[in-house]
């Protein structure tokens, strides 16, 4: 049950489009809070709340560098939660086929 409760926080965090976009932005590497906020047309405090939710879900990690707070995507956590969910609800062939398709499309965009 603890894992289920833990994963609920991940899926709640992923339910918001702003938080999903933050995760996509962090895919490129570490970003300062101000850099993240500059990518959105919402207030700094709102971005801070979104980052707090993502951090509580274990999807981002933060570190301080002087007076800046830097955020990184915790890829392993995201992959583990989504992987467990997909394994539980989708036949393996569908997951593998979609993953291969997504990776191929991303490679062509580069």
Regions found by a protein language model. Name each.
Residues 38, 49, 55-56:
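Alpha-helical residues within the helix-turn-helix
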Residues 2-45, 67-78:
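N-terminal helix-turn-helix DNA-binding core of bacterial DNA-binding proteins
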Residues 43-45, 49, 107:
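Intrinsic disorder/low-complexity segments
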Residues 18, 64, 107-110:
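Intrinsically disordered, low-complexity regions of eukaryotic proteins
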Residues 55-65, 72:
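Beta-hairpin "wing" of winged helix-turn-helix
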Residues 1-6, 27, 74-110:
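Amphipathic alpha-helical dimerization/coiled-coil segments
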Residues 30-31, 55, 86:
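Residue-level detector of secondary-structure transition/capping positions
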